[in-house]
């Protein structure tokens, strides 16, 4: 059967409806909470002269917060399903990169090595000395740089569908070429058309789910915000410094990720001394598309050294 990627007929709606409805229902709850989920506060913070949109879910006192670093071009709403799948007592901090979502575009480009000060300033303004940090895709590079530059601020590190930067095993050239523009974030039909090829995993079977995840709530700013984020990682690599990563690290990688081949996770696992590797069935977007499955692995890792009440010993 051939599926028209620019529209969804009755068969496709029936097949994808339950998954989309479940995920998108949670996406629309950003900031409101639910019967089991604490409400989140959305605010604009000025950090180092940059206006940054931030969402904070308050958790139980004494529990370390989880700071989420997004991938390229996506706003903080994309991972609402993952946040909702976590223990509601866990504080969670999300933010939009400059020029993405609700954060205004910067006037001039920036580089990844300058961004640890942004994360440190964010934690300072929210009153946290230390955080668990999760980075996915591009955000995994930011999480690595933060842990290398400010190891005192990172308690535990989770790297999802990511790589060590320039010195990585790349995906297929056609896939990387499609990543050079923000079109998939602006054109729903195109997003469905390329979802399987780009993201693999569940997106191959249900490109409509991937399309709706990308377009449910994302508020993409000027195109230069995407391009600034894209070029910020040029020339950057963590590879020779990975043995110096101090925090305990969980590496999550999909066995069908066209953007970041799983071999990169195996290389990182070999180089990061205190690391655990978990290879899951799926692709690049499973943290949002199938959050319950991966949330359990993340929570078990983050809670490994906490006391019974969830606080640090």
Question: Where would I find each of the regions flagged by the language model?
Answer:
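Flexible "cap/lid" loop of the alpha/beta hydrolase fold
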Residues: 144, 148, 155-184
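Conserved alpha/beta-hydrolase "acid-adjacent" motif
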Residues: 258-264
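Short beta-strand/loop motif that positions the catalytic acidic residue
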Residues: 245, 251-253, 257
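Conserved HGGG/HGGXW glycine-rich cap/lid loop of the alpha/beta-hydrolase fold
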Residues: 50-102
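Catalytic histidine-centered segment of alpha/beta-hydrolase-like enzymes
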Residues: 282-295
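Alpha/beta-hydrolase fold catalytic core
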Residues: 1-66, 89-90, 303-313
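Active-site loop/oxyanion-hole signature of alpha/beta-hydrolase fold enzymes
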Residues: 94-134
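Conserved alpha/beta-hydrolase catalytic His-Asp/Glu region
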Residues: 168, 188-241
């Amino acid at each position: 059967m051939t599926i028209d990627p620019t529209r969804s007929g009755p068969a496709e709606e029936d097949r994808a409806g339950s998954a989309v409805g479940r995920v998108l229902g949670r996406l629309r709850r950003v900031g409101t909470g639910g019967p089991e989920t604490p409400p989140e506060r959305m605010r604009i913070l000025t950090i180092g002269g940059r206006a940054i949109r931030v969402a904070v879910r308050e958790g139980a006192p004494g529990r370390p917060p989880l700071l989420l670093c997004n991938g390229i071009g996506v706003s903080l709403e994309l991972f609402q399903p993952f946040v909702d799948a976590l223990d509601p007592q866990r504080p969670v901090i999300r933010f939009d990169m400059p020029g993405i979502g609700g954060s205004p575009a910067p006037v001039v480009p920036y580089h990844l090595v300058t961004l640890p000060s942004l994360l440190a300033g964010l934690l300072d303004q929210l009153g946290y000395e230390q955080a668990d940090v999760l980075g996915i895709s591009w955000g995994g590079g930011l999480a690595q740089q933060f842990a290398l530059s400010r190891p005192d601020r990172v308690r535990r590190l989770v790297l999802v569908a990511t790589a060590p930067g320039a010195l990585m095993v790349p995906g297929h050239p056609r896939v990387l070429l499609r990543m050079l523009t923000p079109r998939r974030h602006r054109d729903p039909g195109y997003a469905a058309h390329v979802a399987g090829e780009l993201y693999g995993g569940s997106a191959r079977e249900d490109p409509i789910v991937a399309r709706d995840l990308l377009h449910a709530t994302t508020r993409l700013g000027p195109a230069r915000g995407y391009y600034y984020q894209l070029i910020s990682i040029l020339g950057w690599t963590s590879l020779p410094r990975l043995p110096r990563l101090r925090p305990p690290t969980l590496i999550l990688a999909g066995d069908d990720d066209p953007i970041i081949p799983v071999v990169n996770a195996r290389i990182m696992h070999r180089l990061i001394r205190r690391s655990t590797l978990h290879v899951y069935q799926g692709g690049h977007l499973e943290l949002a598309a199938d959050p319950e499955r991966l949330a359990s692995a993340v929570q078990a890792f983050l809670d490994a050294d906490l006391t019974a009440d969830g606080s640090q010993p």
